[in-house]
């Protein structure tokens, strides 16, 4: 994306100052939030949504995100949810993956390979998630739990959140179930607290990450957490990733969406 090198340079200069002074770090975050670079991803995602692409030369205007084909307003706030056509609970990214394959003719493996952007290559998925997430701004998170598979996904995610595993014997709860924890400069939210959980899911991801000069999504956040716990790679749009997202978003019910967020 044009200008990413400049954004990265500005963040590189700003963050060492914050490292010396926590208040300086907060000021840096506020400056980014006031003129959020993530809006560039929102604009690109909107173009991609309506552009006719892929082997089938189709847009995503027939993609049903749960509220009807092409309806993006409020869709993010009502995900993950059960979709009869796939007989699965899907979050935004896994649902977009389904639509990009079935409607546009892209190969699943190609989308998965380029799911996360780099300094040299932008991710279509991250842009689309940014656009669709922003179309729920001002609305409250309200993941449905009426279908048995939605409740099953929530319960599975709860189990996974608390399950200790891997060489470090860590779980998600190891870092996110107590107050006052931090990794380096990053304060860790206590996800057992309802208000903090609402903030995480409603204003957290997708978010512009200053240290990476890119927007990252919830799937990326979960992937990275798994890696930090020295666990096997978490499959993109996998049943496990959607279960964890279902638990987090279910717990964050009522949070007011404001996306994309801004993170270190």
Which residues are covered by each model-predicted region?
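Electron-transfer interface patches adjacent to heme c in soluble/periplasmic c-type cytochromes
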Residues: 20-40, 51-65, 69-127, 137-138, ...
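Internal, well-ordered alpha-helical scaffold/interface segments
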Residues: 126, 130, 151, 155-159, ...
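Bacterial N-terminal signal peptides that target proteins for export
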Residues: 1-7
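Short alpha-helical "patches" and their helix-cap loops
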Residues: 5, 146-147, 260-264
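Short, charged low-complexity linear segments at domain edges
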Residues: 30-47, 138-158
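N-terminal signal peptide c-region/cleavage motif recognized by signal peptidases
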Residues: 14-16
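Hydrophobic, well-structured mid-protein blocks that either form specific transmembrane helices
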Residues: 128-132, 144-145
């Amino acid at each position: 994306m044009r200008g990413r090198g400049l954004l990265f340079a500005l963040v590189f200069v700003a963050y060492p100052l914050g490292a010396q002074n926590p208040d300086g770090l907060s000021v840096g975050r506020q400056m980014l939030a006031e003129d959020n670079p993530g809006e560039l991803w929102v604009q690109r995602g909107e173009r991609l949504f309506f552009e006719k692409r892929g082997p089938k030369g189709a847009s995503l205007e027939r993609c049903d995100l749960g509220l009807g084909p092409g309806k993006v307003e409020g869709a993010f706030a009502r995900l993950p949810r059960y979709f009869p056509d796939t007989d699965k609970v899907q979050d935004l990214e896994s649902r977009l993956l389904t639509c990009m394959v079935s409607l546009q003719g892209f190969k699943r493996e190609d989308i998965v390979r380029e799911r996360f952007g780099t300094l040299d290559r932008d991710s279509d998925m991250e842009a689309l998630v940014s656009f669709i997430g922003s179309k729920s701004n001002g609305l409250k998170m309200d993941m449905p739990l009426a279908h048995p598979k939605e409740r099953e996904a929530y319960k599975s995610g709860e189990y996974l959140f608390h399950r200790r595993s891997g060489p470090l014997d860590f779980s998600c709860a190891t870092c996110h179930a107590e107050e006052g924890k931090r990794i380096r400069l990053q304060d860790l939210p206590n996800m057992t607290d309802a208000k903090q959980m609402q903030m995480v899911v409603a204003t957290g991801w997708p978010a512009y990450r200053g240290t990476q000069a890119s927007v990252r999504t919830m799937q990326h956040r979960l992937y990275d957490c798994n890696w930090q716990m020295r666990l096997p790679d978490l499959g993109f749009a996998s049943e496990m990733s959607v279960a964890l997202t279902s638990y987090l978003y279910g717990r964050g019910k009522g949070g007011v969406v404001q996306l994309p967020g801004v993170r270190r």
